[in-house]
């Protein structure tokens, strides 16, 4: 009984839905900054840096600059694509995509999340140097890094669930094929 409950949680499609919404606060925050908001910025230097980010983009890619001028931060767009990837792991249209692509990508996300998590712990312990942390409210780190961590873990779990569902579906399809072959074989023997 306990194993069935664990399997339901472990193999739930809910992981993909949680992953899909985990990056939306990040996408909203980055979009707010692209629209000129200073929410979460605590120093004038960082405010000027965010405000001047569009000018920095103007010197580089015209595509990224155009997106930014209409209020679309490229990383926010990537967050939305990452959410769509998570949804693909739990919906019927995702099952039409190449399985290997979703499974390899999902496993890579899981491994990468574990590595980054260890590196973050090492930074907090002082084993690795910390990056520049001035100028942003602490909740900004929770929204950005917390969302990325949650996304990584839940995408990994959604991948395991997807892998299990596809394996079960393949077994059912193989049984159906064997059943049809048996019927055809019996029909062939009967008509001989």
State where each predicted segment sits.
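Transmembrane alpha-helical segments in integral membrane proteins
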Residues: 20-23, 71-92, 150-168
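Alpha-helical transmembrane segments of multi-pass integral membrane proteins
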Residues: 112-192
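N-terminal signal-anchor transmembrane alpha helix
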Residues: 17-36
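Hydrophobic alpha-helical transmembrane segments
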Residues: 57-80, 139-153
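Membrane-helix interface motif
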Residues: 32-49, 118-129
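Cytoplasmic juxtamembrane regions at transmembrane-helix boundaries
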Residues: 2-12, 84-108, 166-187
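Perimembrane loop-to-helix junctions flanking transmembrane segments
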Residues: 42-63
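Membrane-interface helix-boundary signature
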Residues: 5-19, 61-68, 95-105, 134-144
């Amino acid at each position: 009984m306990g194993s069935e409950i664990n399997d339901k949680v472990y193999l739930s499609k809910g992981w993909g839905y949680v992953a899909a919404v985990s990056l939306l606060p990040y996408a909203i925050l980055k979009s707010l900054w692209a629209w000129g908001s200073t929410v979460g910025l605590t120093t004038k230097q960082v405010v000027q840096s965010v405000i001047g980010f569009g000018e920095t983009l103007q010197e580089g890619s015209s595509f990224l600059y155009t997106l930014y001028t209409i209020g679309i931060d490229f990383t926010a767009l990537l967050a939305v694509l990452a959410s769509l990837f998570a949804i693909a792991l739990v919906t019927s249209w995702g099952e039409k995509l190449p399985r290997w692509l979703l499974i390899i990508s999902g496993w890579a996300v899981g491994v990468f999340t574990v590595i980054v998590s260890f590196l973050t712990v090492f930074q907090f312990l002082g084993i690795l140097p910390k990056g520049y942390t001035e100028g942003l409210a602490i909740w900004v780190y929770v929204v950005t890094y917390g969302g990325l961590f949650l996304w990584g873990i839940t995408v990994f779990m959604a991948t395991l669930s997807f892998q299990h569902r596809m394996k079960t579906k393949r077994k059912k399809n193989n049984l159906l094929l064997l059943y049809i072959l048996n019927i055809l074989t019996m029909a062939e023997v009967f008509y001989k």
